[in-house]
Curated annotation (Swiss-Prot):
PROSITE patterns associated with the record: CHORISMATE_SYNTHASE_1, CHORISMATE_SYNTHASE_2, CHORISMATE_SYNTHASE_3
GO-annotated biological processes: amino acid biosynthetic process; aromatic amino acid family biosynthetic process; chorismate biosynthetic process
Cofactor(s) the record lists: FMNH2
Amino acids binding NADP(+): R47
Subunit structure: Homotetramer.
Protein task: This reaction introduces a second double bond into the aromatic ring system.
Residue sites binding FMN per the record: R124, A125, S126, G286, K301, P302, T303, A304, T305, R327
One CC-aspect GO term: cytosol
The organism's taxonomic lineage, starting at the top: Bacteria, Bacillati, Cyanobacteriota, Cyanophyceae, Synechococcales
Gene field: aroC
Pfam families attached to this UniProt entry: Chorismate_synt (PF01264)
Protein's name in the database: Chorismate synthase
Organism whose genome encodes this protein: Prochlorococcus marinus (strain NATL1A)
Length: 361
């Protein structure tokens, strides 16, 4: 019941971290959309484990198989099914902790809710579930490029207490991908990498903030009042594993400003487009996109599973000391960048189809 998302462009993800595979079914994608399969694989490669010294060493190729919905590389308008097989899962790594509630992990709440859980690898609570989201998000990005020439870029803004000065309007994809932490500010990236490595050696972890910009978004996306654009973006992004906060535009910083400081003055224009002198609104006003860049940020907590000893309990409520084994990211942010892009793309693609259906010219 909680594994589907969207109204017109819908996705349903399936699979567990240590099961046979994970994947997604997309429904509502328009027909005759020409897809670049390499782009889907490239996005999955950016998400996959084992890609650098600061990510989990789990070695998965994450090669996507497209089972339905395409003729050649064109969409048929029918459900698109994609799957990635799990090849390097190690259930034995979890044999000693399968009845242990890891602090701040989903073990305890899944067990209390369902009375059963896939303890090996975290099951559906694992970040491996996001493979389906990233694959579907890649399709959504290609749809947005074709119909609106929209570009979506995300990057690591902060790790622990190291924050990079970045201008969202100037960031390029190549700048983001030039280092393993996916921060376009190289001097800050070097410090971030050192910090993640240091915490990893201690058996600890750290969190941070990912920032995202949407360039050339269509005007009019968002369905007030309950499906405002920022509301759906918040829901989508807060559904990602390890997320703890969301803000758009000036965010919480805007609460320190006066109205005269925060308001975005409209500029005269000969076109039918809206232009503002500033963008504290982050491209969204009244829950509807105004055509300016959409700028948002997502906070991720430190990885819950760490090698340091922690006090916890088992399923029977007995006090125990946990020292987790297995393979885990000391920081999820570098691999979460394509996840953020994917969820933003899925929301925008869904709202684009809804806008075209309700408010056609």
């Amino acid at each position: 019941m909680g594994s589907s998302f969207g109204k017109l462009f819908t996705i349903s993800t399936f699979g567990e971290s240590h099961g046979g595979g994970v994947g997604v079914i997309i429904d509502g994608c328009p027909p005759r959309l020409e897809l670049d399969i390499n782009e889907i694989q490239n996005d999955l490669n950016r998400r996959r484990p084992g890609q650098s010294k600061i990510t989990t060493p789990r070695n998965e190729s994450d090669e996507v198989e497209i089972l339905s919905g395409l003729l050649g590389n064109k969409t048929l308008g029918t459900p698109i099914a994609m799957v990635v097989r799990n090849k390097d899962h190690r259930p034995k790594d979890y044999s000693e902790i399968k009845k242990t509630f890891r602090p701040s992990h989903a073990d305890a709440t899944y067990q209390k809710k369902y009375g059963i859980q896939a303890s090996s690898g975290g099951g559906r609570a694992s970040a491996r579930e996001t493979i389906g989201r990233v694959a579907a998000g890649s399709v959504a990005k290609q749809l947005l490029t074709k119909f609106a020439k929209t570009e979506i870029l995300a990057w690591v803004k902060r790790i622990h207490d190291i924050e990079a000065e970045i201008h969202p309007s100037e960031v390029t994809f190549d700048e983001i991908e030039k280092n393993i932490v996916r921060c376009p500010n190289q001097s800050a990236a070097d410090l971030m990498i050192q910090r993640v490595e240091a915490f990893g050696k201690e058996g600890d972890s750290c969190g941070g903030v990912i920032e995202c910009v949407v360039r050339n978004p269509p005007i009019g996306l968002g369905m007030p009042v309950f499906d405002k654009l920022e509301a759906d973006l918040a829901k989508a992004l807060m559904s990602l594993p390890a997320t703890k906060g969301f803000e758009v535009g000036s965010g919480f910083g805007g609460t320190y400003l006066k109205g005269s400081e925060h308001n975005d003055p409209f500029l005269p224009s000969d076109s039918n487009q809206l232009k503002t002198a500033t963008n504290n609104s982050g491209g969204i006003q009244g829950g509807i996109s105004n055509g300016e860049d959409i700028v948002l940020r997502v906070g991720f907590k430190p990885t819950a599973t760490i090698r340091k000893s922690q006090k916890t309990i088992d399923e029977d409520g007995n006090a125990i000391t946990l020292k987790a084994t297995g393979r885990h990211d000391p920081c999820v942010l570098p691999r979460a960048v394509p996840m953020v892009e994917a969820m933003v793309a899925l929301v925008l693609a869904d709202h684009l189809l809804r806008q075209r259906g309700q408010c056609t010219d």
